[in-house]
Amino acid sequence: MTEFYDGYETLCVPTSIGDFPVRRGGTGLPVLLLHGYPQTHVIFHKIAPLLDPHVTLIIPDLRGYGDAPKPPSDEAHLAYSKREMARDMAEIMSALGYERFAVAGHDRGGRVAHRLARDYAARVTHLTVMDIAPTLRMFDDTDQAFATAYYHWFFLSQKAPLPETLIGADPAYYLRAKLEAWSGEGEWLDEKAYLAYEAAFSQKDVIHASCEDYRAAATIDLVHDRADDHHKLTMPIQALWGKTGFVAKRYDVIAAWQEVAQSVTGCAVSGGHFVPEEAPQEAAAEMLRFWGCS
C-alpha cells in the first residue's frame, strides 16, 4: 500500500471486523475518500496532491477490496451491505479521532458515502458523490438502455459462484475491459496504477467480495434505502460526473440527488466515469470550493 501517496502515513486502523490499512496526509479539514469498483484507494493518486495542501485526506480500501478485511459472506448479503461498509468507515474515523468530517466517494464508494451520511448524519459535514445517481432511483428506472449499459449490476449480483467463476477465468481481461468501456477518450490510466488494480482484482477473495457488494446492492441495500427514502439529507451535497459517461446521458444528476437531499450543487467535468483520474484538476477545484477551501 506504500507505492502511492508520497509523504503520507500508512496506518493500520482497528475496526470490529479487523485492521484496515489507511493512507493519511495533508492538513486541515478531515476528508474521507472512498473508491469504487473495480479499483482500490489508488484511484485518488492524481487528485490527492491537489487537495492535501488544503485538507487532511484519509484514504482506505473498502471492505472486500484491496488489502481491506474480507469478512465471510452470508445468504442475506448483510456482510457487504452499504450499512456495514459505512460502519467500517465510521469506526476508522473514530479510531483516528475525527468525530466530524467530509466524505467524497466515487462509484461504489459514493454509495457507501451516501449510506454513511444517512446513518451518521451528525458526523458528516459535506458529502461528495462522483458519477452516480442514488441507487434506488437507478434500480427503479431500469429499462433496456440502463440494463445494457449497466449489465454488470445484474451479472455480478447473480448467485455465487457464477460471476466469480467467469471473471476468475481471466480477471485481467475483465478489469481492463471495464476500465476502457466506462472511461472517456484520451490517455488517463497510469500503468503503475493499472498494475495495482490488477494485482488486487486478481485475488479470488476480492472477486467474490466485489460480487457480494453488488448482491447486497440488489437486495438488502434496497430494503435499507426504501426504509429512509422519505427523509432528505440535510448536509450540503455535491455531485460531480463525467461529461461523456452514461450517468450524464441518462440523468439530470442534480435533480436526482435533490430527491434525497435538501441542498445539492455540482457539475459535469471532463471525461467519463473515472472522475478522480480523468479530470483531477477540475474535480479538485470543485471539491475545494465546495469545502470552502479555495
Label each region the model flagged:
Residues 2-11, 17-22, 30, 43, ...:
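Flexible "cap/lid" subdomain of the alpha/beta-hydrolase fold that forms the substrate-access gate
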Residues 29-35:
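Short beta-strand element of the alpha/beta-hydrolase
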Residues 37-48:
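The serine-hydrolase catalytic nucleophile loop
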Residues 46-55, 95:
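A short, Lys/Arg-enriched amphipathic alpha-helix followed by its capping loop at the start of a domain
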Residues 272-284:
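Catalytic histidine-centered segment of alpha/beta-hydrolase-like enzymes
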